From Swiss-Prot:
Its EC number is 3.1.2.-, 3.1.2.2. The lineage of its organism: Eukaryota, Metazoa, Chordata, Craniata, Vertebrata. This is Acyl-coenzyme A thioesterase 9, mitochondrial. It comes from Homo sapiens. The modification N6-acetyllysine is found at K103. Residues 84-209, 289-401 form the HotDog ACOT-type domain. It is an enzyme of class 3 (hydrolase). Mitochondrial acyl-CoA thioesterase. Catalyzes the hydrolysis of acyl-CoAs into free fatty acids and coenzyme A (CoA), regulating their respective intracellular levels. Regulates both mitochondrial lipid and amino acid metabolism. CDD domains: BFIT_BACH (cd03442). It holds the Pfam family 4HBT. Residues 1-21 form a transit peptide. One of its GO terms (cellular component) is mitochondrial inner membrane. One of its GO terms (biological process) is short-chain fatty acid metabolic process.
Length: 439
């Protein structure tokens, strides 16, 4: 079982670089053509015709029904797009506009990663609308939503609340109704923007009423570098299918995994008795059931997205903050986020729902903590809970953390699933002291 480490994002590995046709890397933050962070949500409302106040949301959605005739009957009837057609840059001017800092500030004077997740979610949707832009129509007939956060890789750079941040991204792969989006985040150091984060999201297109799938414009790579990005998108799709097909919900653990669980079970048996029922916790270990934290959120209209469902970025922020608190409580010191991966949006969350979040440590190794957050919703009228998301976060603690031990078969499967996510990370690196990302 190899040691996991911080996944580094390399400028140009996940997106196009200056020499490859798209503007990247060091930039003047005052350049023309760059969106302000506040403009992203405003632009999205304009594209879909969303209401700015809750009382008009029904009327706005009724107007969107009229856009159904603009939907393509097949993908063949849609003009192809280039990667640079969807490329956009967004500025978060924490340094030049100090009034923005309060929203992003932690008590340790660093940047709230949960807020960054919200911004990435909005940016990913806007990028896809740019890819599918219809010049003859004021509003888009598509309802584009986040289907999956494939991965977010952190770089060894500190996130200062006193320096400007820039986001950039573009569509890198397209299927029939889905799109992969590559995004990067940079922070100003001196007179240049340096990369601090690399993210891959998968978005899906729905019809104007968000009831069924809709076709998206095809994507044509224009260079060997773009062809490689597109090929990587195909590989990512295959990897996700393979990972899903071998899920512990579908297949039994491997022989090696079964051995791991059995050895852990044997190490918890009381040597003073000859019984499978008497369990003793090994030294420097914690029962998995004792690592849980829970929270409840009432989903108010303020947290709605442009389609009057609860904003996916809000769900990610709340899940991340609970996961961070779980890792902090478990490890006894300040944790640092290393990776986010495989966040599947299984079901939309309606405004007015009760959101139940349950977080627990499911795997540890050395000073790494793998946290799983399970999200459920229930309406005020019905008591039945429905799963909407499962979130996976990897943290690194400032000191070595206890081992986590499962008691039941179900917890053993959570342990193995956490181990799989942990081992899926890229190979070794060291966390620098200036790498500070907090809730």
């Amino acid at each position: 079982m190899r040691r996991a480490a911080l996944r580094l994002c390399a400028l140009g590995k996940g997106q196009l670089t200056p020499g490859r046709g798209l503007t990247q890397g060091p930039q003047n933050p005052k350049k023309q053509g760059i969106f302000h962070i506040h403009e992203v949500r405003d632009k999205l409302r304009e594209i879909v015709g969303a209401s700015t106040n809750w009382r008009d949301h029904v009327k706005a959605m009724e107007e969107r029904k009229l856009l159904h005739s603009f939907l393509a009957k097949s993908q063949d009837g849609l003009p192809p797009r280039r990667m640079k057609d969807s490329y956009i840059e967004v500025l978060l001017p924490l340094g030049s506009e100090p009034e923005l800092r309060e929203k992003y500030l932690t008590v340790q004077n660093t940047v709230r990663f949960g807020r960054i997740l919200e911004d990435l979610d909005s940016l990913g949707v806007l990028i896809c609308y740019m890819h599918n832009k219809i010049h003859s129509a004021k509003m888009s007939p598509l309802s584009i939503v986040t289907a999956l956060v494939d991965k977010i890789d952190m770089c060894k750079k500190s996130l200062s609340p006193e320096q400007d941040i820039k986001f950039s991204g573009h569509v890198s792969w397209v299927g029939k109704t889905s799109m992969e989006v590559k995004m990067q985040m940079f922070q100003l150091h001196g007179d240049e923007f340096c990369p601090v984060l690399d993210a891959t999201f998968v978005m899906v297109a729905r019809d104007s009423e968000n009831k069924g799938p809709a076709f998206v414009n095809p994507l044509i790579p224009e260079s060997p570098e773009e062809e490689e990005l597109f090929r990587q998108g195909e590989l990512n799709k295959g990897r996700r299918i393979a990972f899903s097909s071998t899920s512990l919900l579908k297949m039994a653990p491997s022989a090696e995994e079964r051995t791991t669980i059995h050895e852990m079970f044997l190490s918890t048996l009381d040597p003073k008795t000859i019984s499978f029922r008497s369990r003793v916790l090994p030294s420097n270990a914690v029962w998995m059931e004792n690592s849980k934290l829970k929270s409840l959120e009432i989903c108010h209209p303020q947290e709605r997205n442009i389609f009057n469902r609860i904003f996916g970025g809000f769900l990610m922020r709340k899940a991340y903050e609970l996961a961070w608190a779980t890792a902090c409580s478990f490890g006894g010191s300040r944790p640092f986020v290393v990776a986010v991966d495989d966040i599947m949006f299984q079901k939309p969350v309606e405004v007015g729902s009760l959101l139940f979040l349950s977080s627990q440590v499911c795997f540890t190794q050395n000073n790494y903590i793998q946290v799983r957050v399970h999200s459920e919703v229930a309406s005020l009228q019905e008591k039945q809970h429905t799963t909407t998301n499962v979130f996976h976060f990897t943290f690194m603690s400032e000191k070595e953390v206890p081992l986590v031990f499962p008691k039941t078969y179900g917890e053993s499967m959570l342990y193995l699933d956490g181990q799989r996510h942990f081992n899926s990370m890229s190979g070794p690196a060291t966390l620098r002291k200036d790498y500070l990302v907090e809730p």
